[in-house]
Every structure is written in C-alpha cells, then in structure tokens.
Amino acid sequence: MTVKKYFSTFLAGTLLATGFVSVAQAGKSDDTLNVAIDRELESIDNYYNTAREGIVISRMVWDGLLYRDPKTNEYLPNLATSYKWVDSKTIEFDLRKGVKFHNGEKFDADDVVFTLNYLADPANGAKPARNVNWWINAEKLGEYKVRLNLKKEFPAALEFLSGPVVIYPND
C-alpha cells in the first residue's frame, strides 16, 4: 500500500469514527450531572478529595468568591461582587444577591462564614491543609458582607480564593 493510499484510508476511517460522535447534554428537568472517569472517587467534596478528577468535578458544582480570568490573570467577582484589602491581613467581600445553591438555599454571608470557619479549624481535616490554613476566621459584617482575617500576610490569598476555596451552603 502506498503512503498516499494509506493516508487516504486512515483519513476516511478517522472521519467515519468521529463523524457520528455527539455531545452529551443534560436535560434541564433531571438535575443530574453525568461524568465518566476511569476510577472510583473517595469523595467529590472539594475539601476531602485530592484526586484530580474529583477536583474537576467539584469545580463544575461549586463556586468561589472570586474567579481568575485565564487570559488577563485579573481577579474578578464570582460569588463576591467586590472585595477590598482593609490592611495586609484583612479582606472584606461584598456578596452577590439573588444566588441559590443546588438545594434551593439562598446564598448569603452565613454560608461564607460557615465554610471559611469550618475550614479554619484543623480538627475538620480539610485536604490539602495548605489550601485553607492561612486564615484565622471569617466574620459576618452584614447579610451580604464578610471579613476574612488572615494569620499573616499571604500574597496568594486571591489566587486561593479564586481556585481551591469554594463556598458551601451552611445547611
């Protein structure tokens, strides 16, 4: 078989094999996320899982306070509408109104304070600890306003708040 004939056969086979592939779409009414992976996960809880697949699935389900734009590397609002550094160890967040969790619970400062204070307690065993061991606590300043108190200056705070630190409902 000549190279040209081999290439033509290969190309035709590839087109046939991929021409009948369709994208998976979830129905709006079934509230189910189907994901195919090659192993069983111990958990899809973002804070008790270190498997890459679990982290990817978690990112499909949960959001953080901030989002880092991959093109500009700018930290943008996500569950927070804005943030400001009060000093080198204190960040305040104004939170987005009108957000609901998957369980129908309204998102507010109680959820952020619950999540961040739960994670600040080493007894709860969040993995990996380096993602969450850099703050002391979170305080509720209003229904949609939160203060995060850091242990010391932490230049990567916004990166962590836009990545591995996601917010859970307090129920």
Give each language-model segment a name.
Residues 81-125, 141, 147:
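Aromatic- and charge-enriched surface segment that lines or borders ligand/interaction sites
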Residues 84, 130-171:
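Surface-exposed binding/hinge segments that line
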Residues 2-10:
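Bacterial N-terminal signal peptides that target proteins for export
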Residues 17-25:
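C-terminal segment of classical bacterial N-terminal signal peptides
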Residues 56, 60, 74, 78, ...:
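Extracytoplasmic/secreted proteins, especially bacterial periplasmic and envelope-associated proteins
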Residues 25-34:
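Immediate post-signal peptide segment of exported/extracytoplasmic ligand-binding proteins
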Residues 36-87, 117:
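N-terminal lobe/hinge region of extracytoplasmic solute-binding protein
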Residues 38-41, 49, 70-71, 88-89, ...:
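Solvent-exposed coil/turn segments that connect beta secondary-structure elements
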